[in-house]
Swiss-Prot record:
GO molecular function terms noted in the UniProt entry: double-stranded RNA binding
Cross-referenced SMART domains: DSRM
PROSITE patterns per UniProt: DS_RBD
Amino acid composition bias (Polar residues), ranges on this chain: 347-361
Protein name as annotated: Double-stranded RNA-binding protein 5
Region spans: Disordered: 220-251, 335-371
Species of the source: Arabidopsis thaliana (Mouse-ear cress)
InterPro entries on file: AtDRB-like_DSRM_1, AtDRB-like_DSRM_2, dsRBD_dom
Tissue specificity as recorded in UniProt: Expressed in the shoot apical meristem (SAM).
Domain DRBM: 1-70, 87-155
Observed effect of gene inactivation: No visible phenotype.
Amino acid sequence: MYKNQLQELAQRSCFNLPSYTCIREGPDHAPRFKASVNFNGEIFESPTYCSTLRQAEHAAAEVSLNVLSSRVPSKSLTAKILDETGIYKNLLQETAHRAGLDLPMYTSVRSGSCHFPGFSCTVELAGMTFTGESAKTKKQAEKNAAIAAWSSLKKMSSLDSQDEEKEQEAVARVLSRFKPKEVRRRETTNQWRRRTSQQDSNKDLLIERLRWINLLTNQASSSSSTSTPNQHKNSSFISLIPPPPPPKSSKILPFIQQYKDRSSQEAKTETATEMINSKAKVNETSTRLSKQMPFSDMNRYNFVGGCSVNPYSLAPAVQMRSVIPVFAAPPPKPNPNLNPSSLSSSVNEFTSSNNSCSVLNTPGLGGQEKKNLTREMIKLGSESRILDQTHDS
């Protein structure tokens, strides 16, 4: 703020830009700064130490502006530069709003002739009235009144003894003393209500937390004292996990050949024993983990898909069918004991049987005639066999 104004004054006056030098004192955790500014060959120092370097430079620039504005030759230029932006009016309005007061009221009075008018302005803030210097325009008169009010408020705030406090905050603290009693009473009651409501909400939260802690501790103690291992198994999450599947048997042929001779009854007994052992292991792990998780009421939970799992029901064992390779049947071996005569007799039998079948199938024969023919054929066949046997011997 003050540094910008001093720089603008130097540019309009065709002077060199102001240069700042700083002195640091105190420890690293609480340093203090004091600055000095060189403006057109003149050096102006900050009156007190400041907590930051920026505050010290602004304090030095403020001292230089106050000194330059008090001099007659450059008073008009300095006042013009200081009031062109209307910074003091803005500062006065912001500070009054921060202090919770009404905005400042400006009253201007015109004097002089019509060709050369003059204006004097007074500003009213917090029950106090401040009068500024007269000016040729109404706007400039209001700015002068704001400058007078700000300078008097700074003197009241005694900034020299409170170097670490910002200027605007100090002025706001001074203005807050001039609040009406009703406003201050209203603010205190509002603050008290806020504090009490916050304390009540904090108490409610604390009571709710304590109630939940007591409830959980009571559940833990009751479950640990009265629950059995089966109840732990029901309330534990691990009990809901199905047992691991039995190891898959190899489908290689030699491995199957080892167990091919076993009966189905033995296989059933072995699978039953494996299921019992796996179930016992799962029960042991579930009871061990349920002691670590006493608050887990896992009867409510379901697996993904919405299907609940019963820890007692086990899936039936899957029996793999043994793969037996199928080979083609070997061709029949020729009988070396066969003679040509036997072959001829077999051929004769075949032909005779065919002839007999054809004779029996002839139309016009009755049932009795067919029976007689079959008996004669059987006799002829038996006689031919006897003749063949005698011939062979």
